[in-house]
Regions:
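Conserved beta-strand signature within the Rossmann-like core of class I S-adenosyl-L-methionine
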Residues: 106-115
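A short glycine-rich, Lys/Arg-flanked "PGG" loop and its adjoining helix->strand segment in the class I
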Residues: 10-11, 91-105
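A short SAM/SAH-binding and catalytic strip from SAM-dependent methyltransferases
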Residues: 62, 73-90
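Conserved Class I S-adenosyl-L-methionine
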Residues: 44-47, 121-147
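A short acidic, Gly/Pro-enriched loop at the edge of an enzyme's catalytic core
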Residues: 52, 65-76
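S-adenosyl-L-methionine
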Residues: 31-65
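Core SAM-dependent methyltransferase catalytic element
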Residues: 140, 156-181
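Conserved SAM-binding loop of SAM-dependent methyltransferases across substrates and taxa
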Residues: 2-14
Length: 181
């Protein structure tokens, strides 16, 4: 919502690519605590200051975001899958299926989220277990690969991701989900 990955992806795809920054109105209203502005204001600032002319904002919830099926090469879900999963795993599966429909055959869905552990209150801590995400991806029909690149061993998974002692340095998983050809 705040534009961190939007900035990176805009630079990665260059002038010939397009980045769709999809958010909900509710998500854009959250306060970006490090910058004392809303997520929407932070996103707009990154777009303006970064000269990100290839970014198109979509402020609508899934599934009806106005993009054609089989039209996207890559989608990223950054630290929000737990928000869908923890209240209702079926809702998370539906989201993955909706995103899969938007991807071209062979397209990639990247997912990163805060790692939770069994037996802890992952909902209140805004986390989820890696295996839960992998099982959802397999149920949705994706090929699944994982990476350890976002792991943070100092996070023992016992605190909310918003705990200031973590300074946002949470232990995260990274999954590469591929839509079959």
């Amino acid at each position: 919502a705040g534009g961190y990955y939007t900035f990176i992806l805009s630079k990665a795809v260059g002038e010939t690519g397009t980045v769709y920054a999809q958010n909900t109105e509710r998500g854009l209203r959250f306060v970006e605590d490090r910058q004392n502005m809303t997520q929407g204001e932070a996103l707009n600032a990154k777009i303006e200051q970064g000269n990100l002319h290839n970014v198109i904002q979509i402020v609508r919830p899934l599934p009806d975001i106005g993009l054609a099926e089989n039209s996207l090469d890559f989608v990223i879900v950054a630290q929000t899958l737990h928000d869908y999963y923890n209240p209702n795993s079926q809702r998370a599966l539906e989201m993955l299926l909706q995103l899969k429909a938007l991807l071209k055959p062979g397209g990639v869905l990247g997912i990163t989220d805060h790692i939770g552990v069994a037996g802890r209150d992952n909902r209140d801590m805004h986390r989820m277990e890696i295996q839960q995400a992998i099982e959802l991806a397999l149920q949705a029909g994706f090929g699944v690969e994982s990476s350890e690149i976002l792991r943070e061993p100092r996070d023992d998974h016992s605190r909310s991701i918003f705990d200031p002692r973590l300074n946002r340095s949470t232990d995260r998983f990274l999954l590469k989900l591929t839509k079959p050809l």
